[in-house]
């Protein structure tokens, strides 16, 4: 099946363990949220544990192995993972044949994939012992020169030579022992069309490009970047270990300032990275690193310098400083990479090398196939031998800048000849494996993922795909495409739909649960409630959808808490937390959403007078101002990330949804050995509410969204232990409570979520000083949170005096005094 109601991953990173089929009644929901048919008949699928919809746990054999594609051509590993793919075996064999053929050619003529991806050492400008070499692939050019500041933009004495493969080259000797082209000087590639016209273009492999900020719509110039040793940034810190599960902070450096201007790499490193680390994220995903001439394109339209950092925020050395600073804080750094298309620009884009030649002599396809109608951009010819340009691009970012992996943008457009345009994928496998599948692009992605993991085995590659392509997140050794994770893109769409179109009473607990668990359990997903997409002008963030204009007038703790703000803060916490806890094996949040930033992004453009006023998304003063309620959402974000850090929620393969009670508006599930209780009812408080669990024993509160530290009312007692009672007849699951062999009772206030952990009494009795403390979950979140009391928690009369007398004093946080015990598979 393309989707299941649970997700689990083999502990073996390479191969899925052998599994037994189970019978399960499914409600079908396709991966990108389109409304499709459903089926109620029983179907045989594979899964490790039940979902709460009467599935049965199965045994696994983690010792199973699978031969590589080179060892056994007939054994297509992915078919052993999903037998439903068997009818498409010929497609996978063809894919494998193409992949192996391409790889063999690369090994035969280039010495292997890693050597093939060293194009930046041959092409573009490279410093040699006694001069500078420059090479450019431009087979359609009739003549070529190199021009720049160094020769007064006169290339008459620097004509280049062309070889049989269309590569132009020149050696520029040193002058008096110094490079003929000074560091940081402007350069361009000048060539003549077949019709005799000369044009100037930015070199395709240039490492840096700048624009004159004093000239409106000035063209970009390539820059020869070769700083002296004293000016080169030297990395000081090693890459941190790859996290068990990524908690990703998606960020745009340029708009990270509180001021209406473009922020710099160094300012981001010094001012923003510590905030990210403080909120317990372990990964930063940087947008808009690749140079793009039009700022408002949000970096999607990459121009010529695919190898160049965006000069708006600083130099290459500044970006290296940022990444090294992130590594020193224990943060992995991923880069948004655009290999799905390129800007249509001619003067400063790779498109400027296309002068009507065939696709064999171009980076792009010719004709309609080389043009994306919706994006107004050019499409790469991935079968061209010059795919080394893109593969080298990946190696360059990994080795020169020490990135730890990539988020590949627009993968859906790459996978299909129709690019996903006007397609509503229903989950029918015929939609994924047909003549519409672009096998050239699939093979390129397989090579790309192989390369990245060959260079950096602990790299993280994430695919942005809305189609739900089966095998996207399976290893290349199984004839999968090789990504480590895929984005769970249907989740934010569902939340936005609920917030825009449904009353609280209309929220379906089963639909929410299905949407969050609707993924291929053998392929890891990164879940998110919102990303940069929801922050762009014309859309709204979750916080703004919940609280709208009241965010501008009712967020002060010095005023009474309005119903809108109370509901908004409560649901903001719940939506993000259940997305993390149930939605995938990784989690992502966009800059500012951790504290409910109210504004949207509006890049400078003609329609707003080229203003940067709305292009400074993160107004940090909102969360730094202690009497504003934004601090509560930020504190909870910090705490839920820390909870995952302690209990490995995202990395756990045990995920069981035991109850989706639509009447009560309550969802109960287990992840690892934690029990989660989400009460989405806007009014009802449930006392003695019975929840099922796996293991017997004593349970305590690990995290409580209603705690005062998080802007709640503090209604859930944290000192009382909850003891389980056995349910049903041992060994007969259908006699249990919600298919769980044990249960305990809790207090569940409206619009709250509470997490319970099982106490290991042996460790408790030993008073082990090395045990982590759940207290830290609250203490870390409470830092600078409770200085100004929220007057809505007390009577109006008592608050007036308290605010006046104690507004500058810290108050007790009431932090939990609970030790954390590691139990089960955690």
Curated annotation (Swiss-Prot):
Q: What is its EC number?
A: 2.4.1.18
Q: Which CDD domains match?
A: AmyAc_bac_euk_BE, E_set_GBE_euk_N
Q: Where is the transit peptide?
A: 1-58
Q: Where in the cell is it found?
A: Plastid, Chloroplast; Plastid, Amyloplast
What InterPro entries does the database record attribute to this sequence? A-amylase/branching_C (IPR006048), Branching_enzy (IPR037439), Glyco_hydro_13_cat_dom (IPR006047), Glyco_hydro_13_N (IPR004193), Glyco_hydro_b (IPR013780), Glycoside_hydrolase_SF (IPR017853), Ig-like_fold (IPR013783), Ig_E-set (IPR014756)
A Gene Ontology biological process in which this protein takes part is: glycogen biosynthetic process
Pfam name, any one: Alpha-amylase
Q: Does the keyword Cell wall biogenesis/degradation apply?
A: no
Q: Which Gene3D superfamilies match?
A: Glycosidases, Golgi alpha-mannosidase II, Immunoglobulins
Record-level Gene Ontology MF annotations: 1,4-alpha-glucan branching enzyme activity; cation binding; hydrolase activity, hydrolyzing O-glycosyl compounds
Organs and tissues of expression? Expressed in roots, leaves, stipules, pods and flowers.
Q: Which residues form the active site?
A: 409 (nucleophile), 464 (proton donor)
The residues forming the signal peptide are none
Q: Where is this region: Disordered?
A: 782-813
Reaction catalysed by this enzyme: Transfers a segment of a (1->4)-alpha-D-glucan chain to a primary hydroxy group in a similar glucan chain
Instruction: State the pathway, as annotated in the record.
Output: Glycan biosynthesis; starch biosynthesis
**Coiled coil located at which positions?**
none
Keywords linked to the UniProt accession: Amyloplast, Chloroplast, Plastid, Transferase, Transit peptide
Q: Choose one Gene Ontology CC annotation of this protein and give it.
A: chloroplast
Note the subunit structure: Monomer.
Give the protein's function.
Answer: Catalyzes the formation of the alpha-1,6-glucosidic linkages in starch by scission of a 1,4-alpha-linked oligosaccharide from growing alpha-1,4-glucan chains and the subsequent attachment of the oligosaccharide to the alpha-1,6 position. May preferentially transfer long chains during branching.
Family of the protein in this entry = Belongs to the glycosyl hydrolase 13 family. GlgB subfamily.
Q: Under what name is this protein listed?
A: 1,4-alpha-glucan-branching enzyme 1, chloroplastic/amyloplastic
- The species is Pisum sativum (Garden pea)
Gene, per the UniProt record: SBEII
């Amino acid at each position: 099946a393309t989707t299941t109601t649970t997700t689990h991953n083999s502990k073996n990173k390479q191969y899925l363990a052998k599994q037994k089929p189970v019978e399960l009644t499914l409600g079908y929901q396709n991966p990108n949220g389109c409304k499709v048919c459903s089926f109620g008949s029983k179907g045989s699928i594979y899964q490790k544990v039940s979902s709460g919809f009467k599935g049965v746990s199965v045994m696994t054999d983690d010792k199973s192995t699978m031969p590589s594609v080179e060892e056994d051509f007939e054994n297509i590993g992915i078919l052993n993972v999903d037998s439903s793919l068997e009818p498409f075996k010929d497609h996978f064999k063809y894919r494998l044949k193409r992949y192996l053929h391409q790889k063999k050619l690369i090994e035969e003529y280039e010495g292997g994939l890693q050597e093939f991806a060293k194009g930046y050492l041959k092409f573009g400008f490279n410093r040699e012992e006694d001069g500078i070499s420059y090479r450019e692939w431009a087979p359609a050019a009739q003549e070529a020169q190199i021009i720049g500041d160094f020769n007064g933009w006169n290339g008459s004495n620097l004509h280049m030579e062309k070889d049989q493969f269309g590569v132009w080259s020149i050696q520029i000797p040193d002058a008096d022992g110094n490079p003929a082209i000074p560091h940081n000087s402007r350069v361009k590639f000048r060539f003549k069309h077949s019709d005799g016209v000369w044009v100037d273009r930015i070199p395709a492999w240039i490492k840096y490009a700048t624009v004159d900020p004093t000239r409106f719509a000035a063209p970009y110039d390539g820059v020869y970047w070769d700083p002296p040793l004293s000016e080169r940034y030297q990395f000081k810190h090693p890459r941190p270990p790859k996290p068990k599960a990524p908690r990703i902070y998606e960020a745009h450096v340029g708009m990270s300032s509180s001021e209406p201007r473009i922020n710099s790499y160094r300012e981001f490193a010094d001012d923003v990275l510590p905030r990210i680390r403080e909120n317990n994220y372990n990964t930063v995903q940087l947008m808009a690193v690749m140079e793009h001439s039009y700022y408002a394109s949000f970096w999607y339209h990459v121009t010529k310098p695919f190898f160049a950092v965006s000069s708006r925020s600083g130099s290459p050395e500044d970006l290296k400083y940022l990444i090294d600073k992130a590594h020193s804080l224990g943060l992995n750094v991923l880069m948004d990479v655009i290999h799905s298309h390129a800007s249509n620009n001619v003067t400063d884009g790779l498109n400027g090398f296309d002068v009507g030649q065939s696709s064999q002599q171009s980076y792009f396809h010719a004709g309609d196939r080389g043009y994306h109608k919706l994006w107004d951009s050019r499409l790469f010819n991935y079968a061209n031998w010059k795919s080394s340009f893109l593969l080298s691009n990946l190696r360059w970012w990994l080795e020169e800048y020490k990135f730890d992996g990539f988020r590949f943008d627009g993968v859906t457009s790459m996978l299909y000849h129709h690019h996903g345009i006007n397609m509503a994928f229903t989950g029918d496998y015929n939609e994924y494996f047909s003549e519409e599948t672009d096998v050239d692009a699939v093979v390129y992605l397989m090579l790309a993922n192989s390369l990245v993991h060959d260079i950096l085995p602990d790299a993280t590659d994430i695919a942005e795909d809305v189609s739900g392509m089966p095998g996207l997140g399976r290893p290349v050794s199984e004839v999968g495409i090789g990504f480590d994770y895929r984005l769970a893109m249907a989740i934010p769409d569902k939340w936005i739909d609920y917030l825009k179109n449904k009353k609280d009473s209309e929220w379906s607990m089963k639909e929410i649960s299905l949407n969050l668990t609707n993924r291929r359990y053998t392929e890891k997903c990164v879940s998110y409630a919102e990303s940069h997409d929801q922050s762009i002008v014309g859309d709204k963030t979750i916080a703004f959808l919940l609280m709208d204009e009241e965010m501008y007038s009712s967020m002060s703790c010095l005023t009474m808490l309005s119903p809108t703000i109370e509901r908004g803060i409560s649901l903001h916490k719940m939506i993000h937390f259940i997305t993390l806890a149930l939605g995938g094996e990784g989690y992502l949040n966009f800059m500012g959403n951790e504290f409910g930033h109210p504004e949207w992004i509006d890049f400078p453009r003609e329609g707003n007078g080229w203003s940067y006023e709305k292009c400074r998304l993160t107004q940090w003063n909102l969360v730094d101002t202690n009497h504003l309620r934004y601090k509560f959402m930020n504190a909870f974000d910090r705490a839920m990330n820390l909870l995952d850090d302690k209990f490995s929620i995202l990395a756990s393969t045990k995920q069981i949804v035991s109850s989706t009670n639509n009447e009560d508006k309550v969802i109960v599930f287990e992840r690892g050995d934690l029990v989660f209780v989400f009460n989405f009812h806007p009014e009802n408080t449930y006392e003695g509410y019975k929840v099922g669990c796996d293991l017997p024993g004593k349970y305590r509160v690990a995290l409580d969204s209603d705690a005062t530290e998080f802007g709640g009312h503090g209604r859930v007692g944290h000192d009382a232990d909850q003891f389980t009672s056995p349910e049903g007849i041992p060994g007969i699951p259908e006699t249990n409570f919600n298919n769980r062999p044990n249960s305990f009772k809790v207090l569940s206030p409206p619009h709250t979520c509470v997490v319970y952990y099982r106490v290991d009494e042996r460790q408790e009795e030993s008073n082990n000083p090395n045990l982590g403390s759940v207290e830290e979950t609250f203490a870390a979140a409470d830092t600078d949170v409770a200085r100004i009391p929220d007057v809505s928690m007390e009577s109006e009369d008592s608050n007036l005096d308290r605010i006046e007398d104690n507004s500058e004093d810290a108050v007790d946080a009431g932090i939990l005094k609970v030790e954390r015990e590691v139990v089960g598979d955690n």
